[in-house]
C-alpha cells in the first residue's frame, strides 16, 4: 500500500502514527510469500490483526506492517460428538464464536465479544468468564521467522501460560491458521439450543441465575457474556466511548505466596500450583528450536491477584485522568484505559505508567501490560 493509513485507524485504541509500509496479503499462500519477502529485506516488521491488542507510538512504525486479513473456516473430520475447525488467522474472533453458537457447538461461547483476529487468540492465550482458548485449542499452523518454514505446532508446543505463550514471548513468526475442537451437545430446540460448557465463573452464573457448574444453551450464555462485557465497555460499540480501548490494559499479576500474604486481608487472590515449564519441541535441524524462548515463570509462583482491586485500592478510580490528558481510566472498568477522543499514544503510556507506579508504591506489585506496545515503554 503506497499511502498507508495511520495505525490509529487500524487499532481499537485509535492512537498511533503512520507506518512506512502496510501489506495485506489476501490469502494464506500470499501471506506466506509476502512474509518471506519482507523478512528477506532485513527491515523491521510488525504483525497486525484486528488491532485490539496493539498500541503503537505516535511517530508510527519505521518498517513494514503485515496486516493479517485472511479469512475462512473449514470443518475437519472429528469423532462423533466433537467438532474440529481450521480457522484462518485473519478471521474475526467474535464472528467465529457467533458461528459456533449458531451451529450449537460448545467450547468457546464464554469468549464472546473479545475483539481481534483468530490468529492472535493463541498468541495471547485469551480467556474470559471461566473459559480459555487453551481448552479448545488443538494447535496452529506457524510460519517461522528464523527458518522460513511452515510447521504444525500442537498445543503442548506453544508454551501457554496466563495470557501468554511462547509465540508472544519471542517465538517470532506468523500464525497462519488455528485448529480448534469443540463439543456438540445438541438438544432439541433448534439453532443455539445446544448446551454450553459448565459455567465456571461466579459473575456469569449470577447473571444467568444458575449455580456454578450449570449448563445453559450456548446462545443464552453468549448473550449473557455480551451483556456483561458491554456493561464494562468491553464490547466495541461506536455509541460507547468507554469501548475505545485495548480492553483490559493490565493482566492479573501472578506473585509468590509471600507477596500475596503481605497484602491486606480483603485483597482477592487465587491459589495456583507451580506452572509447568514450556515445552518447545524440535523445529530446527539440530533437534532444538533455534530461538531460546523464555519460560512462562521461573519460580514457584502460587497466587494470582486482582489487578482491578490493586488499582482501585491504590486510589485510582473509574474515570481518573491525568491533567491535560486525552486518556482516562474507563468509567465502567478500572482495568481499561480509554481514548476520550483526542488521546495520543504518549497519553496512554503516561497514564499506564502512573497507574503501575502507584500500585507498585502501595503494594510492591508490578503490573504488566496486556496489549503489545510498539515504540512505547512504561
Curated annotation (Swiss-Prot):
Question: Which residues are catalytic?
Answer: 163, 248, 370
Q: Do the record's keywords include Aminoacyl-tRNA synthetase?
A: no
Record key words, sorted? Cell cycle, Cell division, Cell shape, Cell wall biogenesis/degradation, Cytoplasm, FAD, Flavoprotein, NADP, Oxidoreductase, Peptidoglycan synthesis
Q: In which pathway does it act?
A: Cell wall biogenesis; peptidoglycan biosynthesis
Instruction: Please state where this protein is localized.
Output: Cytoplasm
Major enzyme class: oxidoreductase
Entry's Gene Ontology BP terms: cell division; cell wall organization; peptidoglycan biosynthetic process; regulation of cell shape
Catalyzed reactions per annotation: UDP-N-acetyl-alpha-D-muramate + NADP(+) = UDP-N-acetyl-3-O-(1-carboxyvinyl)-alpha-D-glucosamine + NADPH + H(+)
Q: Does the keyword NADP apply?
A: yes
The FAD-binding PCMH-type domain extends over 15-185
Q: Which GO terms describe its molecular function?
A: FAD binding; UDP-N-acetylmuramate dehydrogenase activity
Q: Which InterPro entries match?
A: FAD-bd_PCMH, FAD-bd_PCMH-like_sf, FAD-bd_PCMH_sub1, FAD-bd_PCMH_sub2, MurB, MurB_C, MurB_C_sf, Oxid_FAD_bind_N
Q: Which Pfam families match?
A: FAD_binding_4 (PF01565), MurB_C (PF02873)
Of the GO CC terms on this record, one is: cytosol
Supply the EC number(s).
1.3.1.98
User: Which cofactors are named for this entry?
Assistant: FAD
Q: Which family does it belong to?
A: Belongs to the MurB family.
The protein's role, per its UniProt record? Cell wall formation.
UniProt protein name: UDP-N-acetylenolpyruvoylglucosamine reductase
Query: Species name for this entry?
Result: Leifsonia xyli subsp. xyli (strain CTCB07)
Protein's gene: murB
